[in-house]
């Protein structure tokens, strides 16, 4: 199910990093994702195929997610984890992310491993667990730094003398990737890009509450929608009817679970590990809600997928004490899931709207072609186009002034926006689209041709 094209800007940056890692040139963007890129680059060197390299990491990540989810089940002394395993394995978003040229799924596997050792620390207070916890946190910083706020509640460990082993493990594993990254980037360059990109993420382009126009209400709606619609194929407008069946099952499981928790059992003797689990997810929820791009990037909700899968597992268990009945319920729930996931994975193998534009321009036979677009799309086309007859220009006032020159030289002009200066020219519009539930970013694009 691996893909063979760059579906968006972020995928391109990670794909290019496998060939030539350079944070200064956004291959990939800061903070560099050094450990992920190191692994990706080495697998790519063996396979010479970025799709296979990415899906290999994705496959290992799925294995680790399921393995340590089972370990967590046993650690919490819960039974019948088989339902959750199947729900996770057939999850459409996990399948898509396992093939996307990004570190998110690998980061999720590390988050679950790290959380497992945090719970072990709470239950057993062993030095080994403190050390491993610190090491994995350091590795996580080199794979998916934005998942680290999940562990802010673990700061309570500072009152335990053994936390020094976690600090030691963190310093060793972080130093193993950060020192080489600073060395190859240059100390001054690293500080400069750290300052610029950190400020840019929070205040300019990062899609945070400080840089976007979306209200807190809209951000909350998007977050919940992404968790259920993208994460678990809940019904939404223009989706296949099978998502309605899927949604009914999810609602039934949730209602049954909440009845069991709040009406049949009194919330007594809540253990510390349960409180910490709640606080970890609350911490990450607040972080994503305020400081991540949830306008069109559902991938930031990935840590909630194992939690919802666990809740669905418990919902199935709460409906019946008879295992045969549970198995029937699970099969009926998974049948539409298999259909939905299969369709989304097949659609993912087809080009995104942005990649379709690239293919369209590659097939342009005219010897004189110029493309006007915004900076991000120009970056994408500049790194992917094979057609050497095409000039790429950013849409700005200075380049607008060159329009007359290209017209006089008989250039064919393409633009991602309508050009008022060419209103007298013959205009053709081309439409490119993909399923937004495969990738929310730029699912519909237009290209305007002037001759």
What are these regions (language model features)?
Residues 56-77, 113-117, 253-259:
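Transmembrane-helix motifs of polytopic, lipid-linked glycan transferases
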Residues 164-246:
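Membrane-lumen/periplasm interface segments of specific transmembrane helices
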Residues 120-124, 149-174, 179, 183, ...:
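Perimembrane helix-loop-helix junctions
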Residues 225-274, 278:
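Hydrophobic, aromatic-rich transmembrane alpha-helices
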Residues 84-92, 116, 137-141:
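Short helix- or helix-capping micro-motifs
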Residues 329-403:
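Membrane-embedded, lumen/periplasm-facing catalytic core of multi-pass transferases
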Residues 30, 99-107, 297:
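Short acidic/glycine- and proline-prone juxtamembrane loop motifs at membrane-interface regions
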Residues 82, 128-135, 168-172, 310, ...:
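Signature aromatic-anchored transmembrane alpha helix within multi-pass, membrane-resident enzymes
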């Amino acid at each position: 199910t691996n893909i063979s094209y760059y579906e968006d800007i972020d995928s391109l940056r990670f794909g290019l990093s496998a060939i030539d890692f350079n944070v200064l040139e956004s291959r990939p963007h800061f903070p560099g994702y050094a450990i992920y890129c190191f692994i990706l680059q080495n697998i790519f060197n063996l396979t010479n195929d970025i799709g296979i390299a990415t899906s290999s990491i994705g496959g290992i990540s799925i294995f680790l997610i399921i393995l340590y989810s089972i370990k967590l089940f046993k650690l919490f002394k819960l039974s019948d984890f088989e339902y959750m395993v199947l729900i996770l394995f057939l999850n459409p978003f996990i399948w898509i992310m396992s093939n996307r040229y990004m570190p998110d799924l690998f980061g999720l596997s590390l988050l679950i491993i790290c959380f497992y050792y945090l719970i072990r620390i709470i239950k057993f207070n062993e030095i080994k667990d403190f050390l491993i916890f610190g090491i994995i946190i350091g590795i996580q910083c080199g794979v998916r730094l934005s998942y680290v706020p999940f562990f802010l509640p673990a700061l309570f460990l500072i009152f335990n003398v053994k936390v020094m082993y976690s600090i030691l493990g963190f310093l060793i594993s972080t130093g193993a990737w950060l020192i080489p990254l600073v060395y190859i980037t240059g100390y001054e360059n690293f500080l400069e890009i750290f300052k610029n990109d950190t400020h840019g993420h929070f205040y300019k382009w990062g899609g945070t509450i400080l840089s976007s126009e979306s209200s807190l209400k809209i951000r909350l709606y998007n977050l919940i929608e992404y968790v259920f619609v993208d994460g678990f194929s809940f019904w939404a407008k223009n989706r296949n009817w099978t998502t309605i069946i899927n949604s009914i099952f999810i609602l039934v499981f949730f209602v049954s679970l909440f009845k069991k928790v709040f009406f049949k059992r009194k919330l007594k003797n809540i253990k510390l590990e349960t409180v910490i689990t709640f606080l970890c997810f609350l911490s990450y929820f607040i972080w994503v809600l305020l400081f991540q791009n949830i306008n069109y990037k559902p991938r930031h909700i990935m840590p909630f997928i194992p939690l919802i899968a666990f809740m669905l597992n418990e919902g199935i268990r709460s409906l019946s004490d008879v295992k045969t009945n549970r198995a029937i319920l699970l099969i009926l729930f998974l049948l539409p899931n298999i259909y939905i996931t299969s369709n989304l994975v097949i659609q993912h193998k087809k080009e995104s709207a942005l990649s379709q534009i690239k293919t369209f321009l590659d097939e342009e036979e005219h010897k004189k072609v110029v493309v006007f677009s915004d900076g991000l799309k120009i970056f994408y086309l500049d790194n992917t186009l094979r057609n050497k007859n095409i000039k790429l220009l950013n849409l700005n006032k200075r380049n607008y002034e060159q329009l007359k020159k290209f017209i006089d030289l008989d250039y064919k002009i393409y633009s991602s926006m309508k050009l008022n200066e060419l209103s007298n020219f013959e205009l053709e519009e081309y439409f490119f689209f993909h399923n937004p539930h495969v990738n929310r970013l730029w699912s519909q694009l237009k290209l305007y041709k002037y001759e």
